Amino acid sequence: PFTVANFVTLAEGKNNYVSPNYKGIHYYDGLTFHRVESNPPMIQGGDPTATGQGGPGYKFKDEFHPELNHGKAGILSMANSGPNTNGSQFFITTDQTSYLDGKHSVFGEVVDGIDIASTVVVGDKINKVKIVRIGQAAKKFDAVKVFKEYFEKQAELQKVLEGVKAKKVALFQDIKTNGTKSKSGLIYKITKPGTGKKPNAGQNVFVHYAGFLEDGTLFDTSYASVAEENGVLDLARKQANGYAPFPFSYGKKTGLIAGFIEGLENMKFGDKAMLIIPGYLGYGEQGTGPIPPNA
């Protein structure tokens, strides 16, 4: 419902979370379709800058439902730049695009005029978006209230997440103080011993992991539960069974960062360990993705 509330409040000029220059205006009126594609087949609009980079001044999370999919032409769905980065940009499919399921939030459908959508070209203008409420459920739907409640809930969740991060930081400090420091500078601690047997060199093992920055920010994990606890669960990845341990040839010296490999070499089957990996044993000065330089 909050995805619909987003669109409705923007269209009616009642969205209280937009940047000041968009306050009180009918956001979509006069904007253009800045992107028209054949693969994926769709027309995209909702960007006041017409560059594909613009938005309302906020982002909100994905909202999926198994009955809402991209299985045909005329589906209205949110454009994004990755998980939980929805704003104001939307697209309308001009053919089935089922491979977008679990990646983009469906919130509407063209019931009349899909033939017009197929003739749209880049630069065509959206003259006006008018919200017409048909039926009691639609008339009772308070878009302003629904969107407000979404952000209030997100604020509460953020407080919880800050608490989770604070506990992680305290745990990391404890490991730094009480863990074992190797000659390389890696600090590690076996937090839960396993079977006591060490893998043979070349033996294939499966490794679960959760990677955090020093401030407690989770940057990646093989555990869906850890991702959810830290507020970064990727539903598409979960649906694709992407949260799983990865295979690794024990004793191999390549394929992972040096600190991770060294940590694994200090572990046995079933062990759980905490590793404090200095930047020079990680991604170094260049960093990578969400991991900054020297982290």
Positions of predicted regions on the chain:
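Cross-family detector of peptidyl-prolyl cis-trans isomerase
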Residues: 1-295
